[in-house]
Each structure stands twice: as structure tokens, then as C-alpha cells.
């Protein structure tokens, strides 16, 4: 896998979590996905919500560090 350890996953999480809230919110996820690849197009609001929902296992509208770990290790 891309991430070698849980520490790598946590480091990635905290890079995406721009406001250091402990959660990845929709705007942070959208910014990360847009910047992930130089040629990436902007995602629609619906696409961003779909990505967010895929990782948001507790339905609070945000991705916590545990949810992020589960998402990237899946």
C-alpha cells in the first residue's frame, strides 16, 4: 500500500486537516483532492460529498483520524 504505517497515515491526515480541528471537513477534502494531481479538475460539490461519505462512517459530515485510517487501509 501507499502508506507504510499508521504513523504515515496520521501524518497524511494532519497535512489534509488544514485547520487542525482533528477532522477533515468537506472544504479541506476538496482542496486536497484538487491538489493531489497537477492536472486534476475541480470536483463538483456532489463528487466531494460522495468522497466524504465514503470515509465518514459515523455520519457526522467529517472524516476523523480513525475513519481516515480505515479508508486508506481498505
From Swiss-Prot:
Pfam families from the UniProt entry: EF-hand_7
Keyword Translocase: no
Domain EF-hand stretches: 4-39, 43-74
Gene3D superfamilies: EF-hand
Binding site for Ca(2+) 2: 56, 58, 60, 62, 67
The organism's place on the tree of life at top rank: Eukaryota
UniProt keyword terms in alphabetical order: Allergen, Calcium, Metal-binding, Muscle protein, Repeat
Additional information: Is regarded as an important allergen.
Function text: In muscle, parvalbumin is thought to be involved in relaxation after contraction. It binds two calcium ions.
Name of the molecule in the record: Parvalbumin beta 3
Native organism: Macruronus magellanicus (Patagonian grenadier)
Taxonomic path: Eukaryota, Metazoa, Chordata, Craniata, Vertebrata
Amino acid at each position: 500500500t501507499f502508506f507504510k504505517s499508521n504513523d504515515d497515515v496520521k501524518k497524511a491526515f494532519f497535512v489534509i486537516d488544514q485547520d487542525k480541528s482533528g477532522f477533515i471537513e468537506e472544504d479541506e477534502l476538496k482542496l486536497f483532492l484538487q491538489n493531489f494531481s497537477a492536472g486534476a479538475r475541480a470536483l463538483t460539490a456532489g463528487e466531494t460529498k460522495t468522497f466524504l461519505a465514503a470515509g465518514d462512517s459515523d455520519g457526522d459530515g467529517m472524516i476523523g483520524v480513525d475513519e481516515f485510517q480505515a479508508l486508506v487501509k481498505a
